[in-house]
């Protein structure tokens, strides 16, 4: 059994105890509470590059990357310098600014599906807005989403949502009326026949299909060959829209996201995380004829006080500039391959049933023989073993996502030496689970 007592976390424990009296569960987002892995959550003090430090002075190699945005590494000096310059001009205007144009052009140039874009403040907000847009453009009410795909915490999407909902063991959430989710149809991810059946049963009623093209909120699940293309063909056939939620995969699997990687272009795309460079941001965009429905150009209303604020735009612009440098994605892929293949090899040699994989700067490891093709497969994982593995790695200075149902992330700041240290820690932990 891996020790869970050697890591000094006295200050973290004290701060978390106080936090529980101030905030529900002591956190601002449920997965941070470590409910699915056991033990006390770590309270962080500062971050730099591939590393994080907690309030007790412990240092960790980080594979959470603030849940995806930190693809260039934490506190990248060029991003920080750009933000310092922007701060001198103010934190928010509540009015148009040139920086919005700059980031919009960069996003449009990068993402195949996006001809126009609207900036918002989070991935949840982007998905809420795109849902309204799907309905406004098609005049239809029903949507299809996939079990285990997470599109934020809006009521309509909290059906078989994976991610933090799966971590809590809840099928959805109290407080969501049945009438709100009545128009949300669900299918297993990677099951094209199930989607065909839903279209056949609901002709002329489905506004569109939304999915994570590579699932990161049931762990790490990749599409079967032909699945994404099959969805493209089905939505075309039925006059419905195809929406890729690339909040997690955008600019992480490749510069043009999953749609560039797999060669399938949706009608609309949601973005977040990376495009804000670590600041709160979201975006949705797509075909010009669809985006022209958005107010004030069209009748579909959506607004936001801090949308397009200069700090988020500045961090996003500098982050994308860094990602444009030659060799960036080859470097990310090599680091992630070294980590993912190393973890699988070590775990199997230690006698554990595992499966997993990687694309770009995103990876996953399941404690089940697999293959994992959908949410039901992911739920077969040995959650207790994952919890012990997570705690063991934490003891050895490696911070992984505190849930089996979350993907992991690498960054440009991770080195081959970091990966070797991680694999050495994993070998020790896995041999003693």
Swiss-Prot record:
Compartments reported by the entry: Cytoplasm
A GO MF term: pyridoxal phosphate binding
Co-factor(s): pyridoxal 5'-phosphate
Assigned GO CC terms: cytoplasm
A Pfam family the protein falls into: Aminotran_3
Enzyme class: isomerase
InterPro entries, per database record: 4pyrrol_synth_GluAld_NH2Trfase, Aminotrans_3, Aminotrans_3_PPA_site, PyrdxlP-dep_Trfase, PyrdxlP-dep_Trfase_major, PyrdxlP-dep_Trfase_small
The UniProt record lists the keyword Cell cycle: no
Keyword Electron transport listed: no
CDD domains the UniProt entry points to: OAT_like
Record's keyword terms, sorted: Chlorophyll biosynthesis, Cytoplasm, Isomerase, Porphyrin biosynthesis, Pyridoxal phosphate
Subunit note: Homodimer.
PANTHER family per UniProt: GLUTAMATE-1-SEMIALDEHYDE 2,1-AMINOMUTASE, GLUTAMATE-1-SEMIALDEHYDE 2,1-AMINOMUTASE 1, CHLOROPLASTIC-RELATED
Protein name as catalogued: Glutamate-1-semialdehyde 2,1-aminomutase
């Amino acid at each position: 059994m891996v020790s869970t007592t050697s890591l000094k976390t006295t200050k973290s424990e004290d701060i978390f105890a106080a936090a529980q009296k101030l905030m529900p569960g002591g956190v601002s987002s449920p997965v941070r509470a470590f409910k699915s892995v056991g033990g006390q959550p770590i309270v962080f003090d500062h971050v730099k590059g591939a590393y994080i430090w907690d309030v007790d002075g412990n240092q960790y190699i980080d594979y959470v990357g603030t849940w995806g945005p930190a693809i260039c590494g934490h506190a990248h000096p060029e991003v920080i310098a750009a933000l310092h310059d922007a701060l001198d001009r103010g934190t928010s205007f509540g009015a148009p600014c040139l920086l919005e144009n700059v980031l919009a052009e960069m996003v449009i140039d990068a993402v195949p599906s996006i001809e126009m874009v609207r900036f918002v403040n989070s991935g949840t907000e982007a998905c809420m807005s795109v849902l309204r847009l799907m309905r406004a453009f098609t005049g239809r009410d029903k949507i299809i989403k996939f079990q285990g795909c997470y599109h934020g915490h809006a009521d309509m999407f909290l059906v078989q949502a994976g991610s933090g909902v799966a971590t809590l063991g809840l099928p959805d959430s109290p407080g969501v009326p049945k009438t709100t989710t009545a128009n949300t149809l669900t299918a297993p991810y990677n099951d094209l026949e199930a989607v065909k059946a839903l279209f056949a049963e609901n002709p002329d009623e489905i506004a569109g299909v939304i999915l994570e093209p590579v699932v990161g909120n049931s762990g790490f699940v990749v599409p079967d060959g032909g699945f994404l293309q099959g969805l493209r063909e089905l939505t075309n056939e039925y006059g419905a829209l195809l929406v890729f939620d690339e909040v997690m995969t955008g600019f992480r699997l490749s510069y043009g996201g999953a749609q560039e990687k797999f060669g399938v272009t949706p009608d609309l795309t949601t973005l977040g995380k990376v495009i804000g460079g670590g600041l709160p941001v979201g975006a949705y965009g797509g075909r010009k004829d669809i985006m022209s429905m958005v107010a004030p150009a069209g009748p579909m209303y959506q607004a936001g006080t801090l949308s397009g604020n200069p700090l988020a735009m500045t961090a996003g612009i500098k982050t994308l500039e860094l990602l444009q440098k030659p060799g960036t994605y080859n470097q990310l892929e090599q680091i992630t391959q070294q980590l993912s293949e190393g973890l699988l090899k070590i775990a199997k040699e230690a006698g554990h049933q595992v499966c997993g994989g990687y694309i770009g700067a995103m990876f996953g490891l399941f404690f089940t023989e697999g293959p994992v093709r959908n949410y039901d497969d992911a739920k077969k994982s040995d959650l207790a073993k994952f919890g012990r593995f997570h705690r063991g790695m934490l003891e050895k200075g490696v911070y992984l996502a505190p849930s089996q149902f979350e993907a992991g992330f690498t960054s440009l700041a991770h080195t081959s030496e970091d990966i070797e240290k991680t694999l050495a820690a994993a070998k020790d932990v896995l041999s003693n689970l």
